[in-house]
Structure formats: structure tokens, C-alpha cells
From Swiss-Prot:
One of its GO terms (molecular function) is succinylglutamate-semialdehyde dehydrogenase activity. The keyword Transcription does not apply. Keywords: Arginine metabolism, NAD, Oxidoreductase. It comes from Vibrio vulnificus (strain CMCP6). This is N-succinylglutamate 5-semialdehyde dehydrogenase. The gene is astD. InterPro entries: Ald_DH/histidinol_DH, Ald_DH_C, Ald_DH_CS_CYS, Ald_DH_CS_GLU, Ald_DH_N, Aldehyde_DH_dom, SuccinylGlu_semiald_DH_AstD. Gene3D superfamilies: Aldehyde Dehydrogenase, Chain A, domain 1 (3.40.605.10), Aldehyde Dehydrogenase, Chain A, domain 2 (3.40.309.10). Catalyzes the NAD-dependent reduction of succinylglutamate semialdehyde into succinylglutamate. Pfam families: Aldedh. It catalyses: N-succinyl-L-glutamate 5-semialdehyde + NAD(+) + H2O = N-succinyl-L-glutamate + NADH + 2 H(+). NAD(+) binds at residues 220-225. Pathway: Amino-acid degradation; L-arginine degradation via AST pathway; L-glutamate and succinate from L-arginine: step 4/5.
């Protein structure tokens, strides 16, 4: 039973698909996808549940969400184990994701009250009241890299606002999506408030094209996000929130401070989660000269020693495999393409068993036209530069704008960087992959729109209703010109 529709677990009627553990290619989940007809059943179930859910008090909706948070905490180890088996991420990392699933709920609740909710004031004898109302049925598309944590950043704010949800997990991580829904069920969520539809491309197309949804909240690749953007053109009545990828630059200056701390910050930025975070550093700008040379030498040495292994290995690995063999092949093909354009590998990424790829670092300074692509894996491109102004200009030469970072102890360099860089997340002397759940998450350009995450998601899950109210009608002291009573 792979679909959860109107509170009932039912078998998919579409094509069979499986989830393979990327570190050994073993089947960890098997089921059938939802057909277009089943997707419509899920949308209708969400619509039928909408009125009852939105008319509950905020406190009542919040109580269900908090019950889900307790389920997540009580089952955190099972969540971590499932995510590790399905994504190949190290167990220490998936445990942090399970904890973040619960932590983000508290942020979402606070955000609802601070950014939406209700408020009123008196002005000129009138009560000015601001209320917020849910949009309706929200389609939520989840990614594979954080299959438990990231969908929560859409689903929980949507539910708190009074929306109902049809959730489609990534076809790479159906097991995690199924487990999350079972925890919602155990939390006492009313039937139809969330509906789960599993499947691949056809299931996703059917959900995105459904006339019954009022919005679509998406985290995933830029290519898919741009297709959705074109599909939703001319439909201003539907909310579309996109969080996509980035070709993220990290600039190191001669004032980088401690050598080992800088190397560690680069490794955490480029290779954590095997490079499968949308905020990972893809382009590394290093100054020409002795200090830059020393940094590269140390970075190469440290990268060669990174432990790459299956998630339950002892001692624990730093990173695991790519999500699939196809994803691994994509990284190797990208490396080969950069080499053909004139790039020189400082460490060559190599294929291992199943979907494993070792980290690669390639000097692309001599490539005249560097492809502006997101290589979603452990492939770091190095560019040598002469001046900070040149580095920032090169860093901004991208259609994306998700994250960027500067490593420098010089306050003047930081001020120049933050004044001229174009990105939504800009860090100094910290890894690019570091972000706060209280802060906006996202960036301009091809990286998306709005700011999907726990706190700012409240903004796109409800619309403001402004009212000017009085206890009764009243006549002004002077009637408008041309009016007689």
C-alpha cells in the first residue's frame, strides 16, 4: 500500500518502481506509482478536508502539528536509519536531519504567529483588522537530498495556515516519504488533510497540472523548477514557490587566516553530503601567489584523506555515495567535459562501487567560457584570480544566486564583498552550507522565488485579508458633494 489518500492506504495503480540503496544497489522499497486518476482522487480528498481543517482554531491545528513533532522525536532513530539506507548519507548526518525535522516545527509555529495570524488597531474611529486566510490545496514536491527535513519546511507552514496538502516525495526516496506520512497518521491528523502520492515523472506531471490545486511548493532541480514556472505562467491565482539550486561561488583572499581552518571550511562547503546540498560550493576562487598555492596544496592533501564509505561503516565516513548510479555518472561526465575544455584535475573524481564517486577538484582557470551549470555532487572547480574585484565579478557571472561566501579576516574586503555579491545567502568565514531556519533561504535568478523554509514559508502559505470595521454605519458631518439624503 503505497498511496495515502483520504486517510486510507491504497495500492498504486501505475507502473512499479523501486528505491535502491545507492551504496549497494539493494532494493529497500518497492511499490507502484499513482496514476493520474489517483492523483485527482488525492486532490479531491484534500479539497473535501479543507473546510473542516481551516475552520479549526489555530490552537487545534497547532496541537496536531505538535503531536507530529513528538512522533518525530520518538521515532528519530528509525527516521535516521531509513534516510541513511535510502540516500546513502552517513548515519551521523541523517541523525541531524531527523533532529532538524522536529526543530523546524517550532520555528514554523513561531513564524505563523509573528508573520501571519491576526492583529488589529484603531484609526479614525475604525477598527483596522488584519487577518490571514489559507490558499486551499497545496501540492508539495519533496527533494531526495533531505527527504525528511525539507518537505517539512513546506508542509508544516501550509497546515498551520489552514491549507491541506497533496505530497509527492522524490521517486528516489519514497520510503522516507511513506514513513513521514505514517507519523502524521499516528499524530491524529484528520483524514485527507495530507495525501501522499508516490511515483515518478508522470505522477508529478499529473499533480502539477491538476486544476484542483491552489498552489505548488517545490524544492528540487533548476530544470524541473523552470518547467513548472513556464507551466504556471498565466495563472496568477495559483501560488508557486520554487527553491532550486545554485552554482555557488566561494572566494578566498590572501587574508584567509588559519590555513587548516580555511581548508576545513572549504571541505565542509564543497563535499558535505557528497556535494548534494543546493548550497554547496561549486566554484572556488583562490588568489594567485604563494598563499593561494599553499592553500591549494593543503586542500588537495586533506581531500585525498576524506573517508568515503557506506552510511553504517566504522569508523564513520565523512561522505557517502551519490543518490544513484545515474547521478554518479553525471558528475564523471561533467568532469570529463571540463577536462576537454582545458580544465586540469588536481584530484580526479573516480567511480567506485554502486553510486560512489570520490571527491574531485579541477582547476578551470584556463577555460575561456566556463559552463554555468550546477554539478550536484563532489566536484569543485578552482579559479585563480588577481584582485578581489575580479573575483567578485567572476563569482557573479552566473544565472543562479543561491549562496556565496568569503573567507577573509579583513573587514574592508568583507564590506566590498557583501556590497557587490549577488546571492540570497552570503556567509563570511563560515561554510556555504550553513543556514539558519529563522533566516530567509533562497536567492535571486535561476535559484528560485520567494524564500522556502520554516520561517519565511508562512508568507506564501496564507494571503492577508485587510478589513476596516465599525459596529454600525454612520453619517459623516458633511456629505460628499452631489449627494442629498
Amino acid at each position: 500500500m503505497t498511496q495515502w489518500i483520504a486517510g486510507e492506504w491504497v495500492e498504486g495503480l501505475g507502473e512499479e518502481f523501486t528505491s535502491l540503496s545507492p551504496y549497494d544497489n539493494q532494493v529497500v522499497w518497492r511499490g507502484k506509482g499513482a496514476t493520474a486518476e489517483q492523483v485527482e482522487m488525492a486532490v479531491k480528498a484534500a479539497r473535501q478536508a479543507f473546510v473542516g481543517w481551516k475552520t479549526l482554531s489555530v490552537a487545534e491545528r497547532e496541537a496536531v502539528v505538535l503531536a507530529f513533532a513528538e512522533q518525530v522525536k520518538e521515532n528519530s532513530e528509525e527516521i535516521a536509519q531509513v534516510i541513511a539506507k535510502e540516500t546513502g548519507k552517513p548515519l551521523w548526518e541523517t541523525r541531524t536531519e531527523a533532529a532538524a525535522m522536529a526543530g523546524k516545527i517550532a520555528i514554523s509555529i513561531r513564524a505563523y504567529h509573528e508573520r501571519t495570524g491576526e492583529s488589529q488597531k484603531e484609526a479614525a474611529g475604525n477598527q483596522i483588522v488584519l487577518r490571514h486566510r489559507p490558499l486551499g490545496v497545496m501540492a508539495v514536491f519533496g527533494p531526495y537530498n533531505f527527504p525528511g527535513h525539507l518537505p517539512n519546511g513546506h508542509i508544516v507552514p501550509a497546515l498551520l495556515a489552514g491549507n491541506t496538502v497533496v505530497f509527492k516525495p522524490s521517486e528516489q526516496t519514497p520510503w522516507t516519504g511513506e514513513l513521514a506520512m505514517k507519523l502524521w497518521q499516528a499524530a491524529g491528523l484528520p483524514q485527507g488533510v495530507i495525501n501522499l502520492v508516490q511515483g515518478g515523472k508522470e505522477t508529478g506531471i499529473a499533480l502539477a497540472e491538476s486544476k484542483g490545486i491552489d498552489g505548488l511548493l517545490f524544492t528540487g532541480s533548476a530544470n524541473t523548477g523552470h518547467l513548472l514556472h513556464r507551466q504556471f505562467a498565466g495563472q496568477p491565482g495559483k501560488m508557486l514557490a520554487l527553491e532550486m539550486g545554485g552554482n555557488n561561488p566561494m572566494v578566498i583572499t590572501d587574508h584567509y587566516g588559519d590555513l587548516d581552518a580555511t581548508v576545513y571550511t572549504i571541505i565542509q562547503s564543497a563535499f558535505i553530503s557528497a556535494g548534494q546540498r543546493c548550497t554547496c560550493a561549486r566554484r572556488l576562487y583562490i588568489p594567485l601567489g604563494e598563499k593561494g598555492d599553499a592553500l591549494i596544496t593543503r586542500l588537495v592533501e586533506a581531500t585525498k584523506k576524506l573517508r568515503v564509505d557506506q552510511p553504517f561503516a566504522e569508523p564513520a565516513p565523512f561522505m557517502g555515495p551519490q543518490i544513484s548510479v545515474a547521478a554518479a555518472n553525471f558528475i564523471l561526465a561533467a568532469q570529463a567535459n571540463l577536462q576537454s575544455l582545458g580544465g586540469e584535475s588536481l584530484i580526479e573524481a573516480k567511480a567506485g562501487e554502486a553510486a560512489f564517486v570520490t571527491p574531485g577538484i579541477i582547476d578551470v582557470t584556463n577555460i575561456a567560457e566556463l559552463p554555468d551549470e550546477e554539478y550536484f555532487g563532489p566536484l569543485l572547480q578552482v579559479v585563480r584570480y588577481q584582485t578581489l574585484e575580479q573575483a567578485v565579478e567572476l563569482a557573479n557571472d552566473t544565472r543562479f544566486g543561491l549562496s556565496a561566501g568569503l573567507v577573509s579576516t579583513d573587514d574592508g574586503e568583507w564590506q566590498y564583498f557583501v556590497d557587490h555579491i549577488r546571492a540570497g545567502i552570503v556567509n563570511r568565514n563560515r561554510q556555504l552550507t550553513g543556514a539558519s531556519g529563522d533566516a530567509p533561504f533562497g536567492g535571486p535568478g535561476a535559484s528560485g522565488n520567494l524564500r522556502p523554509s520554516a520561517y519565511y514559508a508562512a508568507d506564501y502559505c496564507a494571503y492577508p485579508m485587510a478589513s476596516m470595521e465599525g459596529e454600525e454605519t454612520s453619517l459623516p458631518a458633511t456629505l460628499s458633494p452631489g449627494v442629498e439624503l
